[in-house]
C-alpha cells in the first residue's frame, strides 16, 4: 500500500496534491483540523430533520465523515480503495462509525477502481475486478436521515440499489452530478437528481455540481 501523509491534522494519500492545495487555500478549520467542503456540508445539513443515521457513499479519506460522525448517532461509510480506507480510519474514529470495504451499485458484483495520482478524489469504477459491489438496500439500515453520494459518476446506480431505503427513510440527500462524470457510464448528467425526484424528493438547492434534495 502506498504511503500516507498528514496535512493540517488530516491524513491523505502521500501522492495527493489537489486536495492539499484546495484545503490550504480555503483554510477552513474544524476542531483544530483543516476541513473540506464545510460550507457545502453545512448547507446540506440545514435540511436534516433528525440526527440518527448518516451514510457516506464514496467515503474517500473521511473528509465528510470526520464531521458527520460527530453529528449523527450512527455513521455508515462505503469506500472501495484500500489506501483511502487507511486514511479514513486515521481521520474518523468512534464506536458509532462503520466502514465498509466496497462500492455501492444497483447489483452485486466485483469491480476495479481507477485512481488518479495527485487527485485521489477522482477515483471511479473501471470495469470488472475483485472489489465487492453491493446494494445499499441489502444492509437494511434503519432511521437513515442523511446520505452523501460522491462516487464520480456512479451515483445513479448507487441510489437505485438503495431505493427501498430511500422510500422508507426519506433522508436528506446530497449527490454530486458534475458535467461529464455520469456520461462516462452512459448515464444522464443529472440522472441521479431526476431519479430522486421520481421517488418524491424535492430539489432544495445546488452548489457547484452538488444537488441537495429532501422529502417534505
Regions found by a protein language model. Name each.
Residues 92-96, 166-169:
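Short helix-capping segments at alpha-helix termini
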Residues 86-87, 109-110, 182-185:
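Short, charged, surface-exposed secondary-structure boundary motifs
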Residues 55, 76, 100, 132, ...:
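Conserved Rossmann-like nucleotide-binding pocket used by diverse enzymes
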Residues 8-41, 95-142:
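Glycine-rich adenosyl-binding loop in Rossmann-like folds that engage adenosine-containing cofactors
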Residues 1-95, 192-195, 203-216:
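S-adenosyl-L-methionine
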